[in-house]
Each structure stands twice: as C-alpha cells, then as structure tokens.
Amino acid sequence: MKLTKILILLLAFWLEPLSASPYFSFKKYQVEDGLSHNTVWCAIQDSYGFIWLGTSDGLNRYDGRGNKVYRNVLNDKFSLENNFVEALIEEDQNIWVGTNSGLYIYDRATDRFSYFDKTTQYGVYVSSEIKKIVKTENGLLWIATLGQGLFIYDPKTEVLTQNSIQTSFVWDVCQSYDKKKVYVSSLQEGLLCFDENGKFLQSYRVSSDVNSSDSYKINCVLDVEGEVWLGAGNNLLGRLNRQTGTVENYMAPSLNFGAVRSLLKYTENELLVGTDNGLYLFNRESKTFLRADNPADPRSLSDQTINGMMWDAEGALWVLTNLGGINYMSKQTKRFDYYSPAYLSGIAGAGEVVGPFCENKDGNIWIGTQSGLYFFNTVTRELSEYHIGGVKSQKYDIRSLMLDGDCLWIGTYAEGIRVLNLRTGSIKEYTHSRGIPNTICSNDVLCIYKDRKGEIFVGTSWGLCRYNPDADNFMTITSIGSMISVGDIYEDMYNNLWIATTNSGVFSYNTLSGHWKHFQHEREDSTTITSNSVITVFEDNKGVMWFGTNGGGLCSFDPKTEAFIEFDSALPNKVIYSIEQDQTGDFWISSNAGIFKINPISKAHFRQFTINDGLQGNQFMARSSLKSSEGKLYFGGINGFNVFQPERFVDNSYIPPVYVTDIRLSYLNDEQEVKKLLQLGKPIYMADKITLSYENNSFTIRFVALSYEDPARNRYSYMLKGVDKEWITNSENNSASYTNLPPGEYEFEVRGSNNDHQWNEKTTTLRVVITPPWWRSSFAYFIYILLLMGWIVWIAWRWNLRVKHKYKHRMEKYQIAKEQEVYKSKIGFFINLVHEIRTPLSLIRLPLEKLQEIEHEGKEAKYLSVIDKNVNYLLGITNQLLDFQKMENGALQLNLVSCDIKEIVNDVYSCLLY
C-alpha cells in the first residue's frame, strides 16, 4: 500500500496531464465540396431523406453525393426571391423557407417557390427576418421573426395571427415535452411561455445574477424531458425552475465560450452546447462542461462559431457553423476513440506519430511516440506526457516498450535503451560503443522482448542481442548475423522464438533445444514466406503463427510442412504493420490503407475502416498495437492513436431510400436545359417516367441511397430492362450510362445499400421512353401504310389491266386465226374453182392451136385470133390467181419487166371490142 502511494506521487510529479476525453472528429462539407455558402443557418431532413441546408447564399438540397442549390433567378417568378435562408420546416411534403425578408414555400410537386402571401385580419404580411419555424403537436406553425414578433398559422383554416404585444424580436421557439406549452425566446422580455394555442401565460427573465434586473438575450431554448434549458450570452447556460419560476444559471467564465447559440440532447445525462467558441458537453447531473472539439485538430470543427445542430435519421450529428460550412459526425466515427498528443498539447509535432504500447499491472497504458513517452489512464481517459528523468526538454524517439516488474524498458532510435524504474523514477542507459565489449548491437533499438524463461532479447538495426542480468551487459547473437535488422520478436506456445527481420525473412529459435531455422522468400517456391521484409509476428488463439510483411501481405505458417500460406491476395494493401485478435476470433490488421477486420478461418466478413470511420489516419505504424486486459484494441499511426472495443461495434442498420436524382445527356450539362428538354414539372426523384427524343438516346442516370454515414461506400445494383441481361451489382458508382439506345420503352431499376451493406430490397423504377425520329413516328407509319395500300391497289390495277390486255390480245389472235382459216378456206375454194376454170381453158387452147395451124382467112382468122387472145388472157388471169396463192404462202418470186402501157390498153380495148 505504501509502495502504491509512492508510485502515485512520483507519477503525479513526472506526468503532465493534457486531456480527459477523446475529442469529436468531423467530416466537412464546404463550398469546395459544392455547398453554396460556408455560413449555414439551419438544416432539416425531409420525409424523403434529403438534407436541406439554409445558407447566406441560397437553399441547398444535399443527398450525400451531390448538392442542388436553389437561388434567385432573374426574371423567374417561381425562383427563391431571397437567398439568405435562416429557417426551414417541412409541411405537407413542401418546404417552408424563412429568409431575412419574408417566408417562401417550395412546392415539391412543381419544383417551384411561391411567396407566403397570407395576411392577418389586419392585413399584415410576414415580411421581417425569420429566425425559426416550429410545428407544434396540434398542427400550428409558429413563426419567429425579428421585428414583427410571433406569427401563428393554422394550415387547416389558413388563418394567420400575429402576437407582437410581449415582444417584437423573437429568436427561438420550442414546444414543451408534454406538448401543452410553447416557450419563446425574445430579445426584450427573456423567455415567454404560451399555451399550445398561442395564449400568453407568463415570462421569465435570465441574468447572470439573481438580484440583477439585467436580462440576457436568449438565443436558444430546449426542453429535455420536462427540463427547459436556455442558451444566452456571456458564457451562460440556464435551466428553468418551473416550481419557483426562476432561471438557474450555469456559467462557465473560465471556458470563455461566449454566447450559447444552440442546444441539443446528446445522451440521457448530457447536452451538446454550441457556442461562439466551440462545442461543449454539459453533464446535467454533475453540472460540468467538457470541451468536445479541439481547435488544434484539423479533423475537429472547421469553425468555432456554431449556428445550429441537428440529428438525422441515422443518429448522426450535423453541426452548422458560421464560416466553416457543415461538420458531420456519424455513429461510425464514435466507434473509435481518437487521441493525439500533438492536438492535446496544441504543439505541432508533439508526439503525433505513435509507436509502441505497453500495459502495466493496473491496466493503464504506456505509449511511445517520436517525441517522447506518454501515459494513458484507462479509467479517466486522461492522456499525460511523462518527462523521463523529470527533464521536459528530453525527448526520445521511442520504438519499443517492455515492462519488466517495476522497470519500463524503452528502446529508442539512435539513443539506445533507457530503463525507467517506475518506483523510484531513476533512469539507466544502455548504448552501443565500439570500444567497449558486450554493449547492445546498435543504438537503433527496434524491439525488446522477454521470453518465458525471463531472458530479454533486443532487436536492433544491426542484429540481435541478449541481456545478461548478472553482468549487466549484452551478448550479440551471431546465429542471425550482424547485418540483419531485427524488427519483431515473439515466443510461441511451443517455445519457439520467432525473430522477424526487415531484410532476411524470419528466424526461429527453439529455447529448449537451441536449434535455429531460417525461412526466406524464394520467387520460384510459393510455399516460402511471401516477403523477406517481415514487419510483425503474431500467434492466434489456436497457436497458428502469422506474419505481416512489407509488400507481401499476410501469411501463416504450417509447422507440419514448414510451408507458408498466403492469406488472401485480394487484400487492399500488402503492407501489414500489426495484428490483433478480438474476443470473437476476428483479426484486426493495421496497414497503409486503414484497419482491416478479417475472420482468419472463413475469410468472410471482410471490413475496411479508414479515416472516414474515425481512424487517426489511413497510415499506421509498425508494431504499434495492443490488446488490453479488458479487451480493448489500441492502434497507433502517424496522427495519434485509436482505442475501441470490437465487441461493441454495431453496424449501421438504417435502410436508406433510393432515388433517381438526375439525368445527364451526352452533349448537354446545363441542368435547367435538361429540365426543359425533359418537360418535367416536378423533381426527377418524384417522376416515374421520362421521355427522350431519338437525338438524346445517350444519357447517364444518377441515383443515390440517402445514407450519410459514408456515402462513398453505399452500394448499388441496377438494371435497364431490354438492355442489361442481368443486374449490375456491388457498384459504389452512383450512376449508369447508356449510349445509342434504339427507340422504344425501357424500365430502369435500381436498389441501394448503406455503408454497412444493409440493402433496401425495394426497387426504385423509372420508365425511359425514347421517341423515334419523325420518319419512324406513328403518323409516319400511318402514311407509310397508306402509301403501301395505294401501291398495292396500283399494282392490282396494273395486274388487272395486264390480264385484260393479255386476254384481249389472245382473243384478237384467235379472231385473226379464225379469219385466216376462213380466208384460207375461201382461197382454197377459189383456187379450186380457178383450177376448174383453167382446165377447160387448157382443153380449149389445145384444139384452138390445132385450128390455128390451119390457115384461115377473113373473119374466121380474125375470130380465131380473138378466141386465142382471150383464152390466153383467161389463162394468164388464172395463173395470176394461182400466183396470188403463192404470194400468200410466201413462195412467189416477182419477175418485173418493163412494158408499154399503151399496148396493154390497146389489148384490153381490143378484147372488149367484140
């Protein structure tokens, strides 16, 4: 007992306390990220899941991956007329927007703004600066203004009433926990109390002194389970005592946080207090303040002046700042407690790079950094700097720690070993000296390890040595060579001492038999260790040895075959700094890409945690980890260290709604032009169908799952029916592009998950219609059908005409043939008749020739001459008739001769003379 008291006194002397709690870490959303202005006055999450932010330059609708800004548009009467937005509320799915010159209503169905033109019975408009809009349980809207007092609007009856009797300057409105009262903070009269229908009940004054008549301006009011808390100026937080009707003041002049601007319930016993000078936690039981942010920490608040705070549906905190935009803290961020000596001391470079951890008998942690030694009290969570030897200026770059009884062995870079007696505070030094034998191998001490026999081994950048307590010196172990850098040492359950080197693989030394083995990487042999640069050695709860390497990833050792087995070649990073195993058997592995959680047996449930989850950074330090006696894991990196309880991790169970939020065309990026082209009178996330012309058949569909814890890790699965044959899954990209789609009707379906892969199985659907060109339109096809029918009729007419013509031609041929047949029969008959005539003429000619041979005179000779002439003439005619037949048959050959026409006439005449 006496020794413990002495130790506490010594620690109190050498320890310099820095902090008693981890600070909040935030993700920022600012102008550089798409926010319209870094001064954010108000925020709400609507029924769809979107976050609406009111700023000094416009209204923002944020979905985690993108932001749409509503501002005043010149000559557009449906745009927001005033860009200075200070109050927001959702009413009947529409957004009521309070500005510094009146009230506007955003109609979601038409995507338009309209001025709230309702008047009181006296014709008064809401035209002043609006500070707050609150909807009470009975459906009334309470509108706080600066200059016109308090307005109450009933949406059912559309009646607007004004109350400016008690005060004209109202800052905040809050409904009581029992829903029967409404508290109103005013500039002149302090806190006012109304019933739920707007009837004034009483007022309360707030001051720093109960005997003072001065009243502070109340900036904010919050009712927590019946306790009414007030935030005012001059470091004042007040609580209304409803029994006495007075306000109890809790001032913190030592903190100097200025005015309290915003209040929010944090836990059952704690309030979040947003001030002019940072964020504080107020314990309602102990009535104490605790700083929740650190101005020296770049991951803390981006601005110390807080305008407001809000919880979203996932339980994440949104902090609205005056000049730093939005600061977001998710539940995932709260999984990891974060500490940094640099941020705690406010001195840049003061121990921000954290190295080894060492737990003492009381469960507290010693921490080595590049700038000295620190002590972490696990009960009070107080981190303190320990001045070795009581000298503040003495700073060591500490690479290893090992507790041996009351002595803490400290391995440093370039300065050897320091052994700190925790009981007396004395320091003993061990350094390397060339001229003195049996000193440590090198002053660059990388690891110190004590085996089961109690022997202490020291790994340095120039080999391995063993401590000899009897001679108080060191003996170099030559079995591994002096040119080898030893980074880690571990003794397994089989009494094998594993020595990890940075340039020669790993050695194993059996402490019972004294037998050495050397394992190195060989390119041609996959059963060898994956890299010769081994950073850390770890034995799991089943006795399996694991090795984390620099560039070779993680591998395990099979003692039966003496083969090394690579764990998983698909690890995001091949540099393994440290390995710890939790109570459930899962591995937690630090790397250059954050911390991995892996099940070593099933290799399932792989998780990667990064700076976005609250880690000190993505890069950690070699062998900087510890599993404490209470099961907490400690990991150190280049910006401090994290502490967490793995068993308390709870995945994000929020099922996010999924919406299609935007359509981008290949040649048109202007949102307003796209909106006109689509001819949508409402936001696209409310549309179930869009129509595109054939010229716009290449487009990109943007969609989003409204989970804000880590939007970049939300996953999506989508499909365009008619184009995609199967679902495109496991994509973190929240857009899908399609090119040169033929005209037709398609159906786009998308599903989404949050960052912890909690999927929304409900499919969001959008029909996409691509209209054809005019020559492929319905009217064009109607014309084409008419033309086709006309062409068919014309073809039929032409065919009928051709058939008729052909029939007529056949009939004509038949008629001609028939006529020719009749003609031939007539000609035949005529020829026969001619033959009948010719035969007698021939018979007449023969006796006539005989008679002419006898000489006759006188008339007989003349008569015979006439008879002969006519007979010859008749024979000539018959011959000509026969020649006509030949001519008809084409067998006649004309024999043309010249003759005297006069003779022919005389002959004819002479024939007719008688």
Show where each model-derived region lies.
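Residue-level "micro-hotspots" composed of small/polar
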Residues: 19-47, 51, 73-85, 122-127, ...
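Residue-level detector of Asp-centered blade-edge/turn motifs that repeat once per structural unit
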Residues: 45-48, 89-93, 135-138, 175-179, ...
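Conserved beta-propeller blade signature
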Residues: 50-52, 94-96, 141-142, 181-183, ...
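Primarily the dimerization/phosphotransfer
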Residues: 808-853, 883
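Short alpha-helical segment of the dimerization/phosphotransfer core of two-component systems
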Residues: 869-877
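Helix-loop junction within the histidine kinase core
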Residues: 885-896
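A conserved beta-strand-to-alpha-helix junction within the catalytic ATP-binding
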Residues: 895-910
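Conserved small/polar residues in nucleotide/adenosyl-binding loops
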Residues: 914
